[in-house]
């Protein structure tokens, strides 16, 4: 008895900005054609990012790989044609146009681990660095400017030196409590 072929991850190129629609259409095509046994997950890898706009903290999603959809599948002529028939799919990445190559298990694991981490805590869209001047927009030091002393991306916190009555006072703040000065 032969072992069933293993589902591998393939990268499908889609029109930029249509990744979500392509993933949804692909899922619908798989169901419509009754080919669920040939396909696993269909992913558009994204992470949640937090940014400050007009003093408001906003969450949005950022794609890891704009223009690409990850598809877990068993590659054969039927599955290849199904993916290629989905509107706004440009083709597979890797291998040849008629014989696509899957990404390695190591690459797939790295992407899946990154997705897992991204779902735990939203990352800041804005990156800070020591020496940069920021404006505090929340808390007791609101409307004060300060200089970034330290950045802790793990905890999403900054140590900012705020000048109060002519004296530099170190203050620990969350990323959402400050905004960059342009």
Curated annotation (Swiss-Prot):
PROSITE patterns recorded: NUSG (PS01014)
Q: In the UniProt record, which is one GO cellular component term?
A: cytosol
Q: Does the keyword Cytoplasm apply?
A: no
A GO biological-process term: transcription elongation-coupled chromatin remodeling
Keyword ATP-binding assigned to the entry: answer is: no
The record, for SMART domains, names:
KOW (SM00739), NGN (SM00738)
User: Which keywords, in A-to-Z order, does the entry hold?
Assistant: Transcription, Transcription antitermination, Transcription regulation, Transcription termination
Q: Which residues form the signal peptide?
A: none
Which InterPro entries has this protein been placed in? KOW, NGN, NGN-like_dom, NGN_dom_sf, NusG-like, Rib_uL2_dom2, Transcrpt_antiterm_NusG, Transcrpt_antiterm_NusG_bac_CS
Locate the KOW domain: which residues?
A: 131-161
Q: What does the sequence similarity comment in the record state about its family?
A: Belongs to the NusG family.
| Function per UniProt | Participates in transcription elongation, termination and antitermination.
Q: Which HAMAP family match?
A: NusG
Q: Which PANTHER family does the UniProt record give?
A: RHO-INTERACTING TRANSCRIPTION TERMINATION FACTOR NUSG, TRANSCRIPTION TERMINATION_ANTITERMINATION PROTEIN NUSG
Name this protein carries in UniProt: Transcription termination/antitermination protein NusG
């Amino acid at each position: 008895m032969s072992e069933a072929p293993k589902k591998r991850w393939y990268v499908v190129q889609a029109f930029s900005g249509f990744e979500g629609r392509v993933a949804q259409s692909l899922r619908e095509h798989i169901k419509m054609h009754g080919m669920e046994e040939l396909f696993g997950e269909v992913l558009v890898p994204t992470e949640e990012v937090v940014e400050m706009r007009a003093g408001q903290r906003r969450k949005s999603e950022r794609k890891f790989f704009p223009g690409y959809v990850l598809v877990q599948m068993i590659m054969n002529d039927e599955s290849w044609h199904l993916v290629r028939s989905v509107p706004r799919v440009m083709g597979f990445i890797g291998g040849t146009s008629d014989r696509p190559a899957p990404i390695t298990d190591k690459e797939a694991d790295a992407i899946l681990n990154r997705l897992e981490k991204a779902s735990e805590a939203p990352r800041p869209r804005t990156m800070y660095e020591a020496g940069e001047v920021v404006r505090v927009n929340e808390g007791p030091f609101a409307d004060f400017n300060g200089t970034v002393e330290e950045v802790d991306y793990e905890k999403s916190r900054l140590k900012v030196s705020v000048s109060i009555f002519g004296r530099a006072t170190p203050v620990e703040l969350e990323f959402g409590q400050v905004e960059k000065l342009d």
